[in-house]
């Protein structure tokens, strides 16, 4: 189906919603159609309809890893607000995908549960953490995931075990399969030191990352055996600006929005960094999702 086709949805939708409001970068034009879902049944209905009508769509959680286009998105944006968690046992907890990953980690650590302390300070959703296999230099989401529930194109709920999720460094099967991540079950354990561990990790992040400015976290994946931020800094690019976009002075693998940055400016900075490092024989792969105005 072409994006310009007039379509009548059997559920309420919003039009012209500015995606800058749903991105931690504060960048992005209006979505053609926008729908926020709050329940499993609602998500099933929307997903099934979109697939059956072959309508282009993207799924968004907290928007903490997305660079939206200045023109917006000529398709359907499905915004995931499915919240909630439940203990399945003393060693497992199920969390729904729209929940804040950082809040989940903080809640568990405050209750004396270990396993997700590293999540504190990661600004995305549970679903986003699964999608990107979010983590730190020492631990990632894959290390504590037991299983993940998804909604497929028919609106059915399926479950994948950890070994079926194709986890890799900042990668998962969901980057190649457009399934709706519904929930994840995590392995946890009791630990009286968990809250202090979480506090220490958060303090370290606050000291080293530009949390006070709009960004979408690390722009590039670290090359094997090296750190992208260190390489960018050594290339003399820290602090370089283009319009309202700037390579962070605090952490060179972050690009921050200093006021009125556009997606074009951010993408040009990304190209500048890649070209500079490529001239030194180093290839940098983007970690963020760059969402085009139209899907290919």
Swiss-Prot record:
It is an enzyme of class 1 (oxidoreductase). GO terms for molecular function: FAD binding; UDP-N-acetylmuramate dehydrogenase activity. Pathway: Cell wall biogenesis; peptidoglycan biosynthesis. GO terms for cellular component: cytosol. It is found in: Cytoplasm. Its cofactor is FAD. Keywords: Cell cycle, Cell division, Cell shape, Cell wall biogenesis/degradation, Cytoplasm, FAD, Flavoprotein, NADP, Oxidoreductase, Peptidoglycan synthesis. It catalyses: UDP-N-acetyl-alpha-D-muramate + NADP(+) = UDP-N-acetyl-3-O-(1-carboxyvinyl)-alpha-D-glucosamine + NADPH + H(+). One of its GO terms (biological process) is regulation of cell shape. Pfam families: FAD_binding_4, MurB_C. The active site is at residues 170, 218, 287. Disulfide bonds: none annotated. Residues 26-191 form the FAD-binding PCMH-type domain. Its EC number is 1.3.1.98. Belongs to the MurB family. NCBIfam families: murB, PRK13905.1. Cell wall formation. This is UDP-N-acetylenolpyruvoylglucosamine reductase. The lineage of its organism: Bacteria, Pseudomonadati, Chlamydiota, Chlamydiia, Chlamydiales.
